[in-house]
């Protein structure tokens, strides 16, 4: 059996679908459906069972792995709101919870794949190579991810990791199944909906200078599957395309699909000043050295592919 935490979420549900494509459906989905709209993310994926995240505590997980043959855990569940200001909640949910899962996996030799984040690099002034000297988180969400990565790296250095553990530092992910994310959904999602509402696409002033590494969810799933199929490879890896493109390129891609669409530039919000990554670009040397050699979609290709899904199914897997 495989456990996917956050399995009703954006990345988690796509990972379940990716496992389905490998012929695997003996999956336990862990999530919280307090936001009931997330149930739509489960409609087109196959899994054996579901449990609420609040019930999936340390005691439950310990008992479950003692009574079931668990091959791997894809830990994608976390608070991903970069504007969350409750540091105690963030550290308990993202750091302590992940640490508990890690130690159960190490004890039982269960393979662990978990979601880290490119936000650990802060403003990126030192680059985006997987090295502690490059890491300087700008908010408490990023710090929670950074702190767990540091904890794991210490275990690696002490030779205390005796089973596969892979952390993937996701860059700016977009694609199907993110409808429930609200303000945290991708720029592509929001711009598409503005077009459909008859509005102009709204992007921040200076967006042509804001360069991000935008990665389509299908590429994220492909990287996860690569490590799942290569159990001898462990470590923390960047998961981006290796190319930085501007927010304007997203708008241009949508404009190629919706010819009448236009852009409106809006003021940059004060609430984001000093907490906003203006530039991200994954360094892929470590990922490529691990053997992942597939190409990544650029913004133009990926956004058009996403727009097709948004048009046909409202943004859900088909």
Curated annotation (Swiss-Prot):
Catalytic activity: ADP-D-glycero-beta-D-manno-heptose = ADP-L-glycero-beta-D-manno-heptose
Keywords: Carbohydrate metabolism, Isomerase, NADP
Annotated catalytic residues: 141 (proton acceptor), 181 (proton acceptor)
EC number of the protein: 5.1.3.20
Enzyme class of the recorded protein, top EC level: isomerase
Binding sites annotated in the UniProt record for substrate: 172, 183, 190, 204-207, 212, 276
Binding site for NADP(+): 10-11, 31-32, 38, 53, 76-80, 93, 145, 173, 181
A Pfam cross-reference name: Epimerase
Disulfide links within the chain: none
Pathway: Nucleotide-sugar biosynthesis; ADP-L-glycero-beta-D-manno-heptose biosynthesis; ADP-L-glycero-beta-D-manno-heptose from D-glycero-beta-D-manno-heptose 7-phosphate: step 4/4
Source domain of life: Bacteria
GO BP annotation list: ADP-L-glycero-beta-D-manno-heptose biosynthetic process; carbohydrate metabolic process
Xref: InterPro entries: Epimerase_deHydtase, Heptose_epim, NAD(P)-bd_dom_sf
An MF annotation (GO) of this entry: ADP-glyceromanno-heptose 6-epimerase activity
Cofactor note: Binds 1 NADP(+) per subunit.
Subunit structure, as described in the record: Homopentamer.
Domain notes: Contains a large N-terminal NADP-binding domain, and a smaller C-terminal substrate-binding domain.
Role description: Catalyzes the interconversion between ADP-D-glycero-beta-D-manno-heptose and ADP-L-glycero-beta-D-manno-heptose via an epimerization at carbon 6 of the heptose.
Similarity section: Belongs to the NAD(P)-dependent epimerase/dehydratase family. HldD subfamily.
Name by which UniProt lists this protein: ADP-L-glycero-D-manno-heptose-6-epimerase
Gene giving rise to this polypeptide: hldD
């Amino acid at each position: 059996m495989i456990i996917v935490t956050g399995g009703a979420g954006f990345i988690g549900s796509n990972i379940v679908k990716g496992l389905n494509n490998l012929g695997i459906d003996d999956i336990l989905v862990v999530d919280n459906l307090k936001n009931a709209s997330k149930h739509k993310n489960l409609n087109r994926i196959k899994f054996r069972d579901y449990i609420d995240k609040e019930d999936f505590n340390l005691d439950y997980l310990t008992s479950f792995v003692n009574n079931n043959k668990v091959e791997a855990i894809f830990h994608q569940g976390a608070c991903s709101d970069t504007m969350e200001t409750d540091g105690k909640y963030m550290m308990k949910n993202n750091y302590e919870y992940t640490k508990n899962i890690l130690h159960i996996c190490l004890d039982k030799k269960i393979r662990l794949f978990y979601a880290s984040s490119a936000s650990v690099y802060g403003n990126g002034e030192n680059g985006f190579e997987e090295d502690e000297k490059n890491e300087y988180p700008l908010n408490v969400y990023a710090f929670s991810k950074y702190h767990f990565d540091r904890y794991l790296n210490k275990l690696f250095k002490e030779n205390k990791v005796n089973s596969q553990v892979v952390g993937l530092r996701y860059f700016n992910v977009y694609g199907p199944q993110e409808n429930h994310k609200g303000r945290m959904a991708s720029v592509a999602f929001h711009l598409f909906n503005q077009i459909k509402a008859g509005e102009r696409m709204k992007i921040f002033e200076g967006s042509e200078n804001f360069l991000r590494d935008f990665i389509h969810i299908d590429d994220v799933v492909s990287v996860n599957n690569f490590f799942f199929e290569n159990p001898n490879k462990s470590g923390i890896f960047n998961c981006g395309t290796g190319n930085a493109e501007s927010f304007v390129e997203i708008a241009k891609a949508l404009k190629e699909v919706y010819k009448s669409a236009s852009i409106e530039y809006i003021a940059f919000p004060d609430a984001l000043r000093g907490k906003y990554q203006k530039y991200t670009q994954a360094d892929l040397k470590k990922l490529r050295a691990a053997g992942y050699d597939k190409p990544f979609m650029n913004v133009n290709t990926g956004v058009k592919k996403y727009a097709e899904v948004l048009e046909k199914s409202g943004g859900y897997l088909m």
